[in-house]
Amino acid sequence: MRNLSLILFILIFTFLSVPAIAGQGALKLPEGSNASAIKHNKEGIFNYKQGYYEDALKHFRLASEDDSSVGESHYNEALCLHKLGKHGEATNHFYKARKYSKGNPAILGSKLINDHSPVKREGS
């Protein structure tokens, strides 16, 4: 009976944990961000959720151009670049995302960002 309880606990924990780590989606910009950047970021998130990574990337790049000091914009760019197999470019934006994260746990705790940029480099 004890073993059965342990097995059930492990199964329940596993199923509840998987959604939290399965997919890392694009992030909203922080409150108070540039209005144009927010608009482009929302368009990017919409396209990203649809699987239109090239279109999403265009919007995330525009959001970054509007305000390059927002870590979420760089993170979203990096997600698209990763999905498109452009891992070198993704790594550069993951470093920028970390640099400008302002402590955002969604960025700092991302497995994907830590896989791409595991060691701090100058400027990150």
Report residues per predicted region.
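Conserved structural position within tetratricopeptide repeats
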Residues: R61-E65, K99
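Register position in tetratricopeptide repeats
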Residues: K49-Q50, K83-L84, H116-V119
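Canonical tetratricopeptide repeat
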Residues: K42, N76, G109-K111
